[in-house]
Every structure is written in structure tokens, then in C-alpha cells.
């Protein structure tokens, strides 16, 4: 090789090396050591306990801030199209967002291949060790977060845009910036429980559902930015509050955590159903929500149920539990009524994406015996910006596959409502509130492949004028019930967007679609409007008629002279059931939901205590319903379980 060629090759190699090194983010050294991980785990923070000793035997280098737009776009230039989405992260040096766990791992692999060095995401233990930098205060900087380090630290329905400029906060003792806030950061671990034993280089369980995120974000209350706080997300989630930083280390983490055990005591034998026949059957309401005694997270507000039946004869009920409906402490709990039992089980944890609001749940029994669960998943708190998740069970709800997104964008039209249906041609139709307000209307999401993919047939137009004879692409009312009529058209009844009827009073709106949910025509339903703390059930019974369960009025908001409805033996108040034999044109059968026995009941949630007697039924509650193969109809309110059959509805009540 001549001198010129040698020099040329040398310069080329130096250029390649220089190019590769330029890709490496600014890094800080984090030495080996040990620390005490977690917190006392009081209240919402139960998953931070127990405090346990962790040894970090391998020092590592960590990027001094989150990976920026400019750095990430060296790997994926097309990501530039997402700059500024939702009002965040416009600049080169702002933290990259709208990246999934897999996106973050792919960047680490690319950076490793490009530089010939070893990059990955931090383990959860490495992240907390690096954040603490030898401290044990709530934040590395102390027990409070200075104003200069805050980026609108509160929950907002409409997030307030802030800069995500990296290195905008002081560095901790290891030289790391932005460890509290800016954006959450993906960690390599599956989310799982802590244990009290001393651990060395832990890396979480070998399998799981959610990946850990740490550090908190903008538009997030202070407590979620604490050093010990644990959050997590579905690995495929992407939104404006999660980014990542990288670690350089030759150490490859090995799984060390616990894998959650599947619940037991669920029978697998298929039940035999005997018809209840023509004899009226009514069972006095019993609670399906009890206080757990095994440490299951349980809060003061238990609400918004869904229910279905299982092939083994059990009923499965779910609902959310929280202190605030906009809260990030929200969990979805379940209880089970085993076939032949009158006592519902104590609640157990059914669904929880840590530190995410989970408003909106539904359950559905599929023809092949599987169960389908759909749920809203917020990017943070509140119930406006929800994605929709879906998962399935093949063993009567004992275990469930990992959830996937039915609709991945965190936006409106995704607040799942109980009561999905299966149409005559095999489509699943799931109703959702179209917005967070009481008069935002409703949407439908449709699957033609048994839940694997979903579409919203909405044309993108604004909210229509919900008036008699009007039409639009959004359903009138929220919390709607949906049925398919005999000609294949769809009908809903809902709450809010009331339409004045011929009697001059506000009535529950009815919406009809003859084109598979693309457009809807509105009219007054003939039934009283309902309001806060109330949700109806609309079902097509196995025997053929349509069934509505709703309320005669709102006990606080309906004008007194408009309260109550006329029934066979006079005026009644509260929950009632009605039947239609002509696709909702007329409703000749109406019965107050009571057996006439006076009793004091606790309806939970917004209902609280009420008297049931011959003229009064439950005054309000969020209803959900299912009909089992034996013909029994099961209605859940916010706390109580009612069961009866068609013969009871049509029976002429005596003494009422």
C-alpha cells in the first residue's frame, strides 16, 4: 500500500470513528455501590414497599438527560413528523416523546451497533440508585421540588404546553439532569412487586404486562415525581409524557423478580343451564362489592360496573375503585358469583396500569366461550385522553392474555361503556363516550374479526345539533345502551343531550343508525331524562323483546312536579324496567324494580343509602347487565346485584 492510500484509509477510519462517537449522548459515571430501595408504601404508594437493600455491583454510565429529538432522529428520521404533537417537544434539544418501549430498545441497539459499545435502558434499580445519588429525601434535591424544576405539576384535562428542553434542571450528585419531571423514562424491567430480601443487581420479573417508567412528567402532580415513585405503561404505548435515557454497561441484567401467580378456585367444568321457565323469579338485591381483607387496593369510591357470565356458570363483575374519578390511583377490581352461590367473592385486583387513570370498562362473553375485556387507559390522570385496550380469557376469567391497544391514541371517543353487543352478522360493537363532558355524545367502535382490530366509523365532523329529527355522526347522549333491531339497524338510548318530547319535558334521547353506525338520526324516546350518577341498561333479551332498565327521574335535579312515573298500581319512583316488542316503537310493559318489601339498602358510590318499598326503588346508580343462558337477567347498580326473569317483568304485581 502506498503512502497516499494509507493516509486516505486512515482518514476514512478516523472519520468513521468520529462519526460514531458523535452519536453518543453526554454521559455521567455512576459508581458501583448499594442503597435502600423503595418507601414505606403508604396509601396509593403501596407498590413502593417494602424498603429493601440493593447492591449495584457494576458501575455504569448514564446519559445526563433524556434522549433528545435530534439524537433519536439520527436513528429514525421519520420521527420528526411527531415533533409538536399535542403541543410538546418541538426543538432539537427537547426530550423525545411518542416512543414506545420497543422504540427505546431499538435505539439502544442501533447506538450499540453504530458505536461498537454497549447501550441499553437502565434497570429500575439502576434508575433509582442513580436518581438518589446517595440521598434519601423525597427528591434528590430535598423533600420539596423547587419552582424552577417544575413543569406544570398538576393534572389537567387539557395539558398545558411546556418546554421539554433537556438539562434544564440542576444536576444531582452523579451529574444527572431532569431526574424529576420533564418526561417519564422507560426502564428495562417488567413491572412487579418488591420483596424484602436483599438483592444484587435486580432486573424485575421474567415476564409481565407493563414496563416500568420512572421520574414523572410534566402536567403531573408532584408526588408522582418522587425518587421512589413507580409508574408503568403498556410496552406499545406512545404519548407526550414518556421518553427515555440510556445506560452504557457491559453488564446484561438477568431477571430476578417475582412472577405473579394466577388466581385459583375458578372451576373449569362447563355449566348446565336449566331454564327458569314461565314462573316469575325475583331475588332481593345483594351487594357484589365487599371490603377486601388481603391487602387488595380498595378506595372509597367504587363505581361504573361491567358484568358477564362465564361458561362455568359464574358471574364476573368488574368496576373501578378510586378516591377521585380523575385519579391515577384508580384500579379495576373484580368479584365473582360462583354458580349456585348467593355470596359474591371478596374483590381482587383485575386490571391496573400503574399510575394511569382507567376510566371505562366492559366485559363480553363470546360465542366460542372466551371472555373479552375492554378498558380505557389514560396517559396520566383524568378520563379525557384515553386509549382503548382489549384482552381475552380462555379459562372463565381466571387468566388473561396481555392487553393490546384496540385504539392506541390517547384522545376522545375512547371512554369504554359497559354493554357491547354482537350483531347478527358477527360484528362486535363497543360504545364509548365521545368526550369527558355530560353532553359530548357517544361513539361506536366496531370489530369484524372478533376483537383483533377495530374501527370508528365517525367522519370526523363536529358535534351535531341533537334535536328531534336531526342527524349526525355522533350518538346523542353519553353512557348509552345499544341494541340491534330486527332489520339490522342500530338503536341507542343515552344520558344527556336530552330532547324535549311532546309533553314539553326533557326526554332521554334515542339515536337510530341504518348504515352500521356511520350516521344517526335523533328523536325523543318517551322516557324521562336521567342525569348525574345514573346510567341505563338497554338489552335485547334471548326471548326477543328489548329491555330497558333506567330511572323515573333524578332525585335531586329533576323538578319535583316531573318526578316519578305511572305504573299499574300508581306512581312510582326510582329504577324501573320496560319491555318493547316492536323494536322500541312502543313500551307497553313497565315495572318498578321492587318486590314491595320495605328495606334499607346501601347503593354505594353516588347513591348511598335509600329505602326500597312498594313505591320506591333504587334512585340512581350506574347500571350494567347480562342475561345468562337459563334466562335469568342480572342487573348491577353501583353496588347491588338484582336478578329476575322475563316472567317477573311481565307479571302483574299484586299489592304494589
Regions found by a protein language model. Give the residues of each.
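Positively charged n-region of N-terminal signal peptides that target proteins for export
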Residues: 1-4
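Sec/Tat signal peptide C-region and signal peptidase I cleavage site
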Residues: 17-19
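A short glycine-rich, aromatic-capped structural motif
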Residues: 22-83, 102, 181
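Short, structured beta-strand segments at or near domain termini in extracellular proteins/domains
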Residues: 240-253
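Short proline/glycine-enriched turn/loop segments at secondary-structure junctions
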Residues: 201-205, 231-238, 565-567, 613-614, ...
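Bacterial N-terminal signal peptides
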Residues: 8-15
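Asp-box/BNR beta-propeller blade signature and adjacent active/binding-site loops
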Residues: 255-656
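Functional-site microenvironments in short loops/helix caps that host divalent-cation chemistry
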Residues: 29-30, 36, 40-44, 81-95, ...
